[in-house]
Amino acid sequence: MTVTGIIAEFNPFHYGHQYLLSQAKGLKIVAMSGNFVQRGEPALVDKWVRAQMALENGADLVVELPFLVSVQSADYFAQGAVDILMRLGIDTLAFGTEQLLDYQKLSRLYSEQAEHMTAYLATLPDHLSYPQKTQSMWEAFAGLSATGDRPNHLLALSYVKASAGKKLQLQPIKRLGAGFHSEAKDQCLSSATAIRKHIADRAFVEKSSPNAALILRAPQVTWEHYFPFLKYHILTAPDLTQFFQVNDELASRISAAIRSVATVDELVEAVATKHYTKARVRRVLTYILVKAVEAPLPEGIHVLGFSKKGQAHLKTIKASVPLISRIGAKPWDQLTQRADTVYQLGHTDMPEQTWGCVPIRPEAMN
């Protein structure tokens, strides 16, 4: 039987995600971001709600990406997620993309030319951001034209690199409806960005997500719920460079800007440059918020939920893969658990995110 892996955030789950799951083959395993997501912000609703949405729409198993995989640049995000999915026994990786290409061929190319392609990146001028350098690399070695603002396609190219040299079939699925960053309300399939933007419009959310009721009744948070905590950490930290990926220049820019801004968006605008993209700045601010430092990734894999098929699959691999189904006195990943504690501070009604939580089983909820 085909075992398909899907890397996702479901922030929040919408009909485009439902379509992606419907097109994936066989047993479907989702490696999902936790309570903070790749572009450096808190998820709109918590990881347990998002896992439930996935399970109600065809996923068989949902596992959590550790914080230092979830909140990373595209290449590290992709590599960490693919590594976890491979340990869970996938043979296929399905992903949405704005541009259907022969990604399998690109993966073979990268497995053969990785050393030269990496060396090419080092020759590019420093004023270019890493995403710009990556686009230039693919244009030089594979003839791909500049991809512009197409995040799913850019992420797909990171999956290409992460899957190089592995026995893994790539299954690109054409993204339907609104663009990734589109805030438009008049698309047949609205984006997660649009749902977050218009979350107060109940009718819009109801037409945009098969799980609207779950989204609307769950505690919802944005960066602004955490700005006072972030500001406190910045103003009181003796040295911001102690935190993950904060260098002297970023520390200086953040410290200089924090007293004159009133929101996270204003802080990001003040700190970002051509070299330091807004996404990178948001990730760095997230590291400061949760006091993240470099640490090894956890050996165990945290299970958020499963169907009957997913449970049967877990039984076949549990002897070879350490699976965490309940976090108690013994921690799973201290950094991820600290991030969960910070996340809970964003809303007075936010439920417990770690201690004693057990995997969601849709059949048991019916």
UniProtKB/Swiss-Prot annotation:
It is an enzyme of class 6 (ligase). GO terms for biological process: tRNA modification. Its EC number is 6.3.4.-. It catalyses: cytidine(34) in elongator tRNA(Met) + acetate + ATP = N(4)-acetylcytidine(34) in elongator tRNA(Met) + AMP + diphosphate. ATP binds at residues 7-20, 96, 152, 175. One of its GO terms (molecular function) is tRNA binding. Keywords: ATP-binding, Cytoplasm, Ligase, Nucleotide-binding, RNA-binding, tRNA processing, tRNA-binding. Its main location: cytoplasm. Belongs to the TmcAL family. Catalyzes the formation of N(4)-acetylcytidine (ac(4)C) at the wobble position of elongator tRNA(Met), using acetate and ATP as substrates. First activates an acetate ion to form acetyladenylate (Ac-AMP) and then transfers the acetyl group to tRNA to form ac(4)C34. This is tRNA(Met) cytidine acetate ligase.
